[in-house]
Design a protein with these regions (language model features):
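Structured, hydrophobic secondary-structure cores that serve as assembly/anchoring elements
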Residues: 1-71, 215-358
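A glycine- and small-residue-enriched flexible loop/hinge signal that marks low-structured segments
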Residues: 2, 27-32, 42, 93-262, ...
Length: 358
């Protein structure tokens, strides 16, 4: 049985991805003494949508997120806890099932213990294919899923902004950065002061996975759009330190996986022929992203991941020692699909492989 609809579905997915790449969604976990707001979720798209917080710091925190960069964030999803809440567990539990959140911040006064708890949670969510990333104060998490904000001495016209309170501004700025550009050198015109770093100190901080702001003598701006990843591996090279690269990879990986889960697995016979039709549809999706300027033209490939497929066959007791590569590709994998997609994100230094196992 063929796949008459899968190409159309991926074309629709590509169109949605291109639109979504212009701006992302910010999640905020807040605390407030207003009992009418507690344990509730609020969708905020403009200042007019901000709830009646008792704590003015929450209002400022949300307003900073709304500033964005080229665009404002698509929306802000705020989960409000009681000020008596012992931890952020309820907020994290809520966001665990919200697949459209791109960047998450803890409260404006997020403690070191709360920051650590979010890091642990974010890393576990990433293992479960979540694309949510955290923007946190002073957190050397060594992970592409955590942006480590270390800016100090920050002020705007309203007064001092702590590092934790600045995180919503950074999350909104990143979410408002189209995927075709980077947030590097993005200006923050509302800021009047930061602790200034020498060029050497700034370079050292960036190399250590810190998201910093610099003063160029005229304005305050982002030093470089990097996350907290420091330790690289053959599978996760230096390109994964860039927020822009990780954002694009997360979007592509999620789109392919969810589209396959929702429209392929269980809907069609998992035959070799159907896999080939699926692969052709995915290639069309990637080519659409090439045309939109997210991927380098002519760089995208998608094929059956023979290494993973052979490993799966061995785990089911199949002797693959005498099988050719083509026979491994055509082998029955029950309800499993193993695909290897290779893309080149514009501005990336190296080719990056995405393994999609469904």
């Amino acid at each position: 049985m063929g796949l008459p609809n899968i190409s159309i579905i991926f074309k629709t997915t590509a169109s949605a991805a291109i639109a979504r790449s212009d701006k992302g969604t910010v999640g905020l976990i807040l605390r407030d003494t207003n009992t009418e707001l507690q344990d509730k979720v609020y969708t905020i798209r403009s200042v007019a949508d901000i709830p009646d917080f008792t704590d003015a710091n929450n209002v400022h925190f949300v307003k900073r997120a709304l500033l964005g960069y080229i665009n404002p964030p698509r929306k802000i999803i705020a989960y409000v806890l009681s000020t008596d809440a012992a931890n952020l567990e309820d907020g994290m539990t809520y966001f665990e099932t919200q697949g459209d959140i791109d960047y998450l911040c803890g409260p404006y006064n997020c403690t070191a213990a709360e920051t650590s708890a979010i890091v642990t949670w974010i890393k576990s969510r990433r293992q479960a294919h979540s694309i949510i990333k955290a923007v946190l104060p002073n957190s050397n998490a060594d992970s592409e899923s955590v942006i480590n904000v270390t800016v100090s001495g920050t002020k705007d016209s309203d007064g001092v902004i702590t590092t934790a309170a600045l995180c919503s501004r950074i999350a909104g700025l990143i979410a408002g950065t189209p995927m075709t550009i980077s947030c590097t050198y993005a200006p923050l015109p509302e800021l009047t002061k930061i602790t200034r770093l020498s060029e050497e100190a700034a370079n050292t901080a960036i190399d250590a996975g810190e998201f910093i702001l610099i003063h160029d003598g005229e304005k305050i701006k982002v030093g470089r759009g990097v996350n907290s990843l420091v330790t690289t591996t053959p599978d996760k090279g230096a390109a994964f330190k860039k927020i822009k690269i990780v954002e694009a990879l997360d979007m592509i990986g999620r789109d392919i996986r969810l589209t396959c889960e929702d429209n392929y697995i269980g809907k069609y016979a998992n035959s070799y022929d159907n896999k080939c039709v699926l692969i052709a549809a995915i290639k069309g999706y990637l080519e659409s992203l090439e045309l939109s300027g997210i991927l380098q033209k002519g760089s995208s490939t998608c094929e059956i991941d023979t290494v993973s497929q052979e490993s799966y066959l061995k785990s089911t007791g199949v002797d693959t020692s005498e099988l050719s590569e083509q026979e491994i590709k055509e082998a029955n994998t029950c309800d499993q699909v193993f695909l290897a997609c290779s893309v080149k994100i514009l501005d990336a230094i190296e080719d990056i492989a995405i393994t999609v196992t469904i």
